[in-house]
């Protein structure tokens, strides 16, 4: 589940800050802290689902990597059925919690999950395509920023300035 990588999910914080500072209407103060907590947990669970499938699909290749070869997913034989059930459970739980926040946050969470599929699973597997691998990971940062926005705001689109900074954020990572 790569809990050590949950720190990356803090990329939702700039979106939360932008939403809190720029929102005049559609602000959700009554659920402010609950939405942030649920949003962060949902984001971490979806990221974990993506890491689980990544670790499983890359285990054979990672055996030859100088540092990745020491990971448990590489050193131990994993049952495909158990991995699939863990991935499915993390996905369902993450998306279910995301749905508690609001429909826009749910859509962004589903998009982050889908990007994990595109990145890891054939026939697309952008991880194996030069430039698309980095682009896919960069788009994930934009998605996280938008997830932060939608944790706070129940509006279809953030202001253009936030949208442009999300694109810039994505281009620089």
Q: Where are these predicted regions, by residue range?
A:
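Multi-pass membrane catalytic core of lipid/isoprenoid biosynthesis enzymes
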Residues: 59, 64-110, 159-169
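Helix-coil boundary and interhelical linker segments in multi-pass alpha-helical membrane proteins
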Residues: 17-41, 93-107, 145-167
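Membrane-helix interfacial "entry" motifs
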Residues: 27-35, 68, 79, 101, ...
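Transmembrane alpha-helical segments that form the membrane-embedded catalytic/substrate-channel core
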Residues: 44-56, 113-123, 142-146, 164-173
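Acidic (Asp/Glu-rich) catalytic motifs at the cytosolic membrane interface
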Residues: 43-74, 123-136, 173
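Lipid-exposed faces of alpha-helical membrane segments in multi-pass integral membrane proteins
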Residues: 7-14, 37, 41, 45, ...
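Interhelical loop and helix-boundary elements at the membrane-water interface
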Residues: 2-8, 72-84, 119-142
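Topogenic membrane-insertion module of multi-pass membrane proteins
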Residues: 1-59, 63, 76-89
């Amino acid at each position: 589940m790569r809990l050590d990588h949950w720190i990356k999910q803090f990329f939702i914080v700039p979106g939360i800050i932008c939403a809190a500072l720029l929102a005049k209407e559609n602000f959700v103060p009554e659920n402010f802290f609950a939405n942030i907590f649920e949003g962060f947990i949902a984001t971490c669970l979806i990221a974990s689902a993506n890491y689980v499938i990544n670790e499983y699909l890359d285990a054979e290749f990672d055996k030859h990597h100088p540092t990745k070869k020491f990971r448990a997913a590489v050193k131990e034989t994993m049952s495909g059925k158990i991995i699939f059930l863990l991935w499915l459970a993390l996905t369902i739980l993450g998306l279910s919690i995301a749905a508690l926040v609001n429909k826009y946050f749910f859509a962004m969470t589903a998009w982050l999950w889908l990007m994990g599929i595109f990145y890891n699973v054939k026939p697309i597997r952008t991880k194996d395509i030069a430039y698309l691998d980095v682009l896919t990971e960069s788009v994930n940062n934009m998605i996280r920023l938008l997830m932060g926005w939608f944790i706070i705001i129940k509006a279809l689109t953030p202001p253009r300035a936030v949208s442009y900074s999300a694109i810039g954020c994505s281009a620089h990572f």
